[in-house]
C-alpha cells in the first residue's frame, strides 16, 4: 500500500456493520441415509431444508423446504453438495418477489470421478417486508440418487461413524443491525 505524501496516516471509517442475529438451517438426514437425492438436469431444483440448527432469536422459520425472513438486511452463505453431475450452480430464489436474489459459483463434479463438491453461494440483500426464499440447484448431468450429495449410509451396528445424522444443504444467515 502506497500513500501519497499528503496522507496523515489515519484511516477513515465508512460505516459500521454489525450483526444482531445469526441462524443456521440445513437439510439434516439420518446417518443411515446413503444419498441426498436425485438431481435432474435441465432446470432449477429446490434443495431440501428441514431443520433449524441454531436460531436463538427466531429470525427464520422453515416450511416445505422454504424459509421466511422478516424485513431487514441479511448476509447469507450456503453450501450445496453435488456428486457426479458435472457443472453445478446454486441460487437464492425469492418466492415472494418471484426473482433470483443471487447466483452462486459454479463447481464441477465429473461424471466418471468419485468426487463430491460443495457449491457455494454468498450474498448480501435487503428486504422491505417478510419474504419467503428457497435454495435452488441446477446441474449439467442427471445423477440418480446421489446427485444431491453422498450420505454416510451407516446402518445400526456400524462402528465407522460416530454421527447419527448427516447434513446436506447448509445455510448460514446473519441479520445486520
Question: What would you call each of these model-derived segments?
Answer:
Residues 17-177:
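Extracellular jelly-roll beta-sandwich "head" domains, especially the C-terminal globular C1q domain
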